[in-house]
Regions:
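Active-site neighborhoods and metal-handling regions in enzymes and metal-associated proteins
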Residues: 1-170
Length: 170
């Protein structure tokens, strides 16, 4: 970069501090934008929960979610992940037909004009209710999440929170 080999480049402490300040501290206007992105993202997921039913295709649910983003003058934060085959990470194929008993994984978000974006994941039972086994797994995952959130605070290494979550699982 600029003809300087990477091994000879030095970091600029003032520049690094300026970037950190921009990322860590938000104005009231920025907070409003962040909240709008999160609100529209939540509405996208709630819409999916309302419309999902056996017999639909994944792309029909995605279209309804996209409509929510677009009707709020938002773009998608990223390509929506919305498969019944959630075991395949980052699956962007939306052509499967939803069957009774399926779980529908959603990872989607809305981006407002200012560039702030939401990113949320949900797992929704196609039949509106979890089976007994699905509920058991959901409750384990939820306990892992809640314990991890309680443990998060400045200075706590990520690995400590990860290990706490793993202990809750087992």
């Amino acid at each position: 970069w600029l003809g300087i080999p990477p091994a000879r480049q030095e970091g600029s402490v003032p520049f690094i501090r300026a970037v950190i300040a921009q990322r860590n501290y938000k104005s009231a206007e920025e907070i409003v934008e962040i909240e709008k992105a999160c609100d529209v993202t939540a509405d996208m997921h709630i819409t999916a929960m309302k419309v999902l039913r056996p017999g639909m295709y994944e792309y029909e649910v995605v279209a309804e979610m996209n409509r929510v983003a677009e009707s709020n003058n938002c773009q998608l934060s990223f390509a929506t992940i919305a498969p019944i085959n959630g075991q395949t990470l980052h699956n962007h194929y939306h052509g499967n037909k939803v069957k009774p008993g399926d779980l529908f994984l959603i990872d989607a978000g809305a981006e407002v004009e200012s560039g702030y974006a939401g990113d949320m994941s949900s797992t929704i039972p196609a039949d509106k209710k979890f089976t007994t086994r699905q509920r058991e797994v959901y409750e384990i995952q939820n306990a892992m999440h809640l314990e991890s959130v309680k443990a998060l605070r400045p200075g706590i290494p990520y690995m400590d929170v990860y290990e706490l979550s793993a202990r809750v699982m087992v």
